[in-house]
Amino acid sequence: MQNEKEGAFKLNNEIVINMEEKVFNGDMLDIGMDNYGVIYNIYKKNNTDFNVEYIDNKKGLDFIKNNSYDICVMFLSFSSIMLKANKQKLVKKICDYLREDGLFYIWDLDKKYGRILNENVKVKISDDITKQIIFKEFNIFKESSYESTKNILNDFFDIIDFKCSDGGYYIKAQKRRRSEYEKIENIISGDKF
């Protein structure tokens, strides 16, 4: 996976995420529990006139209008959400926030039940900018594996690109057209057909 531009690979006991060639265009929603500054720096590097909305807690989501963003990014933050039901609710909200054909990007670490994580993550943003992150998750009941994340996204998004290796994963998904997921939305919200 070392030649993959957006994937993760292990090098000297570090998970390395290469984002040197990543470009985001359009209005972006950056959802994260910790502000690592990675996504903002990449976005700023490639856009002179830009709109990035950063949300770092659940309350911030209440003020977002539907169909407002072209892109949503979660960088090392999807795994911080406890319970599959909460992840499903968030993904549904993100789907609503995105414009038609909007893109949802996730970079995270592959954590299964019963495991703890204490990883050094090196993010290569450009030739001269590298970010070091220490990622710790000691809750053995939290699960945020690539497979479970992909399954949660499948209800509202089409996965158009993914990479999973050496403890990390990347998913790029595109919002489905509303008619394709209205039934799922009704089931989640408790409405009957």
Walk through the language-model features, giving the residues of each.
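Short conserved loop adjoining the S-adenosyl-L-methionine
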Residues: 60-66
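Class I SAM-dependent methyltransferase Rossmann-like catalytic core
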Residues: 1-23
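A short glycine-rich, Lys/Arg-flanked "PGG" loop and its adjoining helix->strand segment in the class I
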Residues: 88-103
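A generic alpha-to-beta junction signature in SAM-dependent methyltransferases
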Residues: 22-23, 46, 98
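Core SAM-dependent methyltransferase catalytic element
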Residues: 155-193
